[in-house]
């Protein structure tokens, strides 16, 4: 029986999360997320979303390339940003109460930012790890025909193995993979966190039927 598979547990709450940051450095003191977006889903359908523009107790230093790619506007940020301390309780509530936390390259990037968010508030993020699903890792497993082996590895261990597995010519970035799946989307607006998440959800709803978890 396959009733243990995620696709058959339709009542589970999934939270997709994505952050836009100052640059690509993973050290929290040099790379704060200025946009934190989340989409909550049940049975593959969006039931709620949050799109926070965030400010901190120091000025942001968004790199030129990052600003261009993400269309960061200092004027818009100054007008719309709210203090991190105000948005964190919602982020924590959504992530802590989700059955699964998802993102594309979440284990390779966003989880480091989430770790810093929790630690900034004197909290541990470790309880999130075992329920984290990285669609980039999982699609890599699909493409390389590497299935999860529950008798010898956890789902998290399986994903980290895939995170560090490379194959020449294998494309796993969100845009490339989604186009391969024939997903329609406003690709020109990618690198806005909420737009990325909407695509991530579409990809998840396609690839879930190919997963053995």
Feature names for model-found ranges:
Residues 19-21, 135, 197:
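Generic detector of well-ordered alpha-helical packing
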Residues 58-60, 138-141, 193-194:
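A short acidic, often aromatic-flanked loop/helix-cap motif at beta-alpha or helix-coil junctions
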Residues 2-121, 126-128, 168, 174-181:
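Conserved non-catalytic scaffold segment of RNase H-like nuclease domains
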Residues 97-108, 113, 117-118, 155-213:
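Acidic, Mg2+-coordinating catalytic module of metal-dependent nucleases/exonucleases
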Residues 79, 130, 189-191:
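Proline- and acidic/polar-enriched loop/turn elements at helix boundaries
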Residues 132-165:
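Short alpha-helix plus adjacent loop in nuclease-associated cores
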